Every structure is written in structure tokens, then in C-alpha cells.
């Protein structure tokens, strides 16, 4: 697999888009994932992303989208988020990337007012619609497994059940190693995602709260997970996810530390290449 970086690491530290893309290549990454809202960026920014990545010979693999409104109980909110997610898919196509990383969100009101089964059905219906659009563009959607108690997809079993029920060839899973650890999902559970996973995120945490730290800064035992991921035979990328560097002025060192640590892990797991 290739080693990538989600470019939000740079943006959240106030670095300009093209600078971040150039630095990603300079550090040694094979690929890049883009965190950008197509409803917020203009045509110039879209072209800048595409052209700078081409110039650096840095393929874009994924575009990240958080769309919690897809499972809102208000149809008008759902319609907006469907159209917004379609705009994301169009951006994925425009950037010549492979997939849309999609975060669905959580059950509302502690699962006590709106029946959980209703939100589950809503998610299935709307994800199928989006998967149809993705398939028409030759793309795929990678659903994020979130580690929070009320997250719709917060375990491998829930992810597998959702994908099986959706039964759509363009709807797949993303594996986030830190999220698996936080959700108390063991490495062997990853085997259930054979043929269902197309993308991977990697970061560390303290074992208690969501952290997105450079590997080695927390408590995650990565190698057992990486060996199971290798066995899946995914033709894709493992992207480092770093959020909110504690010292924004030293974000380059933060990213280099994450790159070096992850590169060593992938080499030990015989996974990069």
C-alpha cells in the first residue's frame, strides 16, 4: 500500500494549500488526501489543488466529507446533505481521486425519540443514492467507522451489517486504526472486512479520547492491526490523519515525526510498496 497524508494537518496550522502539497511531497509521502468543502472553495482553489498535485506528482486518493445531516430526521436537511455530498463526489472526480471518505454521524437524542431503526434505514437509503452517483463517475465511497458510543457505525460488525444491507458495489469501508483501538475492536476483527475495505487511516491516541496523534505518541499497538490489514490485500493507501498540532508553528516537525514513525511501522509489517 502507499503512504499518504490528509492535508488538513497543514490547513489547521494555517499553512497555505500549495505550500502544504509541496511539503507533503518533500517529506516523502506517496499520495495525499484532500479535506476541502466544494461549497466553500472557489474555482481557483480547485484548480490550484489539482495543478499543484500534478506538478508534484502526488496522486490524490481520497476527499474527506463529514455529512451528519444525511441521517437527520428532517427531509429538507437530508436533501441538502445529499446534494452537498454529490458535490463532494463531483470534486473527487474533478481531482481524479478514487474515493469519498464519508462520515455519517450519530444517533440523535440518545436513541430515545427517533427509533434507531429509522435512522439506520435513512442512512441506507441516502447512502445508496450517493453510491449510485459515485458509481456513475467510476468512484467509490469509503464509510468511516467512528469510535463514539452513539455513532451509527461504531464497530466492525455494524459496518459489515450496513454494507451487507446496502448491497452496493460502490459503497465500501474505511479502516481507521486509532478508531478501532478506541472502540475496543481487536485486530482479528479486521478480517471481517475482507473485500469490503478500500482505504485506511492511521494515527495514535491515549486510549481514552480521540486524538489523531503521530504514531508513537500514544498507546496503540499498530503492528497486529497492520498485519491484518495487509492480509486484506487492499489496493489503496494508508493515510496519516493528524489534527490540531499543539504547536502550529512546528507543524512540519509534527508531520515529519508522523511520517517517519509510520514508514517504520509499514516497513516492519511489509505493507508499503
What do the PLM-derived regions correspond to, one by one?
Residues 11, 16, 55, 71-172, ...:
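Active-site acidic/histidine proton-transfer and metal-coordination neighborhood
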Residues 21-26, 43-62, 89-96, 128-136, ...:
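Acidic (Asp/Glu)-rich catalytic clusters
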Residues 33-54, 107-114, 210:
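Glycine-rich, proline-tolerant flexible connector loops at the mouths of alpha/beta enzymes
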Residues 42-47, 78-80, 249-250:
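Metal-dependent catalytic neighborhoods of phosphoester/phosphodiester hydrolases
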